[in-house]
């Protein structure tokens, strides 16, 4: 199977090149047979890449250490599950995995459009095959072929990084890859529109769900990565502004901007050049994320890179795509003129445009902070780093403005908002926000940034709740339905709008959790068995932690484990027993680095987070006297962290609702009173239109 996979990878390249040529020539000559053949080559490339992927997995399962990739990321002791996920554990396999997902989405796109939208499909097939060809060239000629063999066969492999042997890391990278590759479809349709000259909103209509799908996978993938960092890395946080973390955030930010700005083109026929530029930028940032992870130019705990040849190939590809698309946009400028103009600063168009500027400002700050160490080293020859303080200082005010816009955008009028519109829609939400601010201040909340954030969260939630209430009440009155039934029908009759509101709720929940970090408690204690320490929560209650002792297992119970030391801590809250937490140090056979496993007690209100920072005597801990060992214990109390994960679920739910096709418009009520209440389009600060 492995040999078959290697042959399949080599065959895929000429097939892809042939399909690329057929697509462009078919679009130019309008030859239907050429177009059909181009589409069939996409099916063929997908099949061949699946065979190649199965070949790599077969090599992992068969412990074929004659292959460099298998020897580098597996060993005989590794569990079968992690051998299968070894396909995307390293640079070579992850590039192949990327290509096979891209081929899958390309196949799905061609299949769904086999009998419609034929004016776009020749060039769509050509663009998709161009990108597939690029990845195949990288795999075969950039020293990253997963089927490369060693000069000798080692007795065993090096094994997978223990930090990657975690369930979150088995789903975090694939989810991000799904998000990155799914955005290739909107990009392909945008380029097809530039090539065939159909530059109305049709290409946006055809790709809207693809954009949402990509946005959803990126958002969920980022949250999965945050969860992995929180549970596995053992430093007490979930986001460190690591270069590769930033690289995954960048296309999500620009895709969010794109989801807002396309509404202006759909509604008013404006921002056509802007939208073309945003779809190009977002696609390039998905490639940039791949480049950054695999080029070796910037150090990261996530980076797979070993060779720099791949960096130059990626840079050349991105430069070529950028130049070609800019030339196409310039060529089509006469057809990309706006049909209307901005009539007032106080309008939904202005709110969306300002939202775009803030998102792009956020993205630029992240991008510049990420690449600045590389630029500075190239200019001065000295290595520097840009840490979390820079990103947080620059991006917090931008993020707060975006949160405010999440409350303004959904209800402000198109074209020009009147004084009555502003008063009607914002008087109650602003009052609620101010009331929350005063109440929190009187309750003792004195951290200014957190106080402002929570007040704005209350403002946005009130806007959304008011919209749901007005729509439900109107439908219940007009259709004679109960409120629960009316709410259900309200959402299902316009999933795109109300799904967007639900996404807003998820975003607000995540902001709420982020603001809670202002009240984190962080204490470190040296403890001997039997010692107790009291930790006061930001909410006023007291945790009493008792260190019960250290237990050591020498390679028992888990493959590839040399030893593990488990510190047991009993937890009481205001004198009431709350259970036992454990935190560990682990030493793996294939790694000299000690790994930390944290203990977490999570509630809706706060997380109690324990880290075994150090043991008094590691050698002594491995002896019979391990139970008497002293430890350094780091204790953190982190308010509202669970709301990040809850917010992620709500965000995903809202996006799925927005993705789902709405009920046929012919089945909707056409009563003017109901339509007036329920058909205004929403803004989505987090994503769903």
Question: Where would I find each of the regions flagged by the language model?
Answer:
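Solvent-exposed, non-transmembrane regions of integral membrane proteins
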Residues: 1-689
């Amino acid at each position: 199977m492995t040999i078959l996979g290697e042959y399949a990878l080599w065959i895929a390249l000429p097939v892809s090149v042939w399909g690329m040529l057929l697509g462009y020539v078919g679009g130019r000559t309008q030859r239907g047979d050429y177009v059909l053949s181009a589409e069939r080559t996409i099916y063929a490339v997908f099949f061949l890449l699946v065979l190649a992927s199965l070949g790599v997995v077969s090599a992992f399962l068969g412990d074929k250490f004659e292959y460099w990739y298998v020897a580098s990321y597996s060993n005989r002791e590794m569990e079968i599950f992690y051998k299968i996920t070894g396909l995307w554990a390293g640079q070579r396999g992850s590039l192949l995995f990327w290509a096979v997902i891209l081929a899958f989405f390309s196949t799905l796109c061609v299949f769904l459009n086999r009998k419609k939208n034929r004016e776009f499909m020749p060039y769509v097939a050509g663009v998709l095959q161009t990108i597939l060809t690029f990845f195949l060239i990288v795999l075969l000629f950039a020293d990253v072929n997963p089927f490369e063999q060693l000069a000798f066969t080692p007795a065993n492999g090096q094994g997978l990084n223990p930090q990657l042997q975690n369930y979150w890391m088995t789903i975090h990278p694939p989810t991000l890859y799904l998000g990155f590759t799914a955005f290739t479809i909107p990009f392909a349709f945008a380029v097809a529109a530039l090539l065939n000259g159909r530059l109305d909103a049709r290409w946006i209509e055809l790709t809207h769900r693809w954009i949402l799908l990509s946005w959803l996978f990126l958002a969920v993938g980022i949250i999965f990565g945050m969860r992995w960092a929180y549970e596995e890395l053992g430093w007490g946080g979930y986001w460190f502004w690591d270069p590769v973390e930033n690289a995954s955030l960048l296309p999500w930010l620009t895709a969010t901007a794109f989801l807002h700005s396309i509404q202006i083109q759909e509604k008013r026929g404006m921002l056509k050049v802007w939208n073309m530029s945003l779809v190009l930028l977002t696609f390039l940032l998905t490639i940039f994320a791949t480049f950054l992870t695999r080029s070796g130019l910037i150090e990261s705990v996530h980076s797979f890179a070993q060779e720099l040849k791949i960096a130059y190939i990626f840079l050349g590809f991105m430069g070529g795509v950028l130049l070609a698309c800019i030339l196409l946009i310039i060529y089509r400028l006469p057809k990309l003129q706006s049909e209307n103009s901005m009539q007032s600063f106080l309008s939904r168009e202005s709110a969306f445009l300002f939202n775009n500027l803030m998102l792009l400002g956020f993205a630029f700050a992240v991008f510049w902070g990420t690449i600045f160490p590389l630029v500075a080293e190239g200019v001065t020859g000295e290595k520097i780093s840009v840490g979390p303080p820079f990103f947080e200082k620059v991006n917090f005010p931008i993020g707060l403005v975006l949160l405010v816009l999440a409350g303004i955008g959904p209800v402000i009028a198109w074209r020009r908002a009147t004084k009555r519109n502003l008063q009607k829609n914002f008087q109650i939400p602003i009052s609620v926000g101010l009331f929350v601010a005063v109440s929190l201040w009187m309750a003792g909340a004195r951290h200014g940034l957190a106080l402002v954030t929570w007040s704005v969260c209350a403002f946005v939630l009130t806007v959304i709740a008011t919209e749901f209430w007005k729509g439900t009440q109107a439908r219940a009155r007009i259709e004679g339905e109960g409120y629960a039934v009316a709410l259900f029908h309200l959402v299902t009759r316009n999933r795109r709008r109300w799904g967007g509101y639900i996404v807003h709720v998820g975003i607000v929940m995540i902001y709420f959790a982020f603001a809670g970090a202002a009240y984190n408690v962080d204490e470190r204690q040296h403890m001997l068995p039997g010692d107790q320490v009291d930790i006061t929560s930001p909410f006023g209650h007291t945790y009493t932690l008792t260190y019960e002792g250290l237990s050591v297992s020498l390679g028992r119970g888990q493959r590839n484990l040399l030893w593990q030391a488990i510190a047991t801590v009993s937890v009481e809250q205001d004198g009431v027993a709350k259970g036992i937490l454990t935190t560990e140090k682990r030493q793996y056979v294939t790694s000299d680095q000690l790994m930390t496993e944290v203990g977490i007690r999570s509630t809706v209100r706060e997380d109690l987070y324990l880290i075994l920072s150090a043991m008094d005597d590691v050698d002594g801990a491995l002896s019979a006297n391990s139970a008497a060992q002293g430890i350094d214990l780091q204790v953190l109390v982190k308010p509202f962290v669970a709301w990040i994960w809850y917010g992620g679920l709500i965000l995903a739910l809202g996006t799925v609702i927005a993705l789902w096709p709405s009920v046929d418009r012919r089945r909707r009520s056409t009563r003017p009173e109901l339509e007036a209440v329920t058909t205004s389009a929403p803004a989505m600060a987090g994503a769903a239109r």
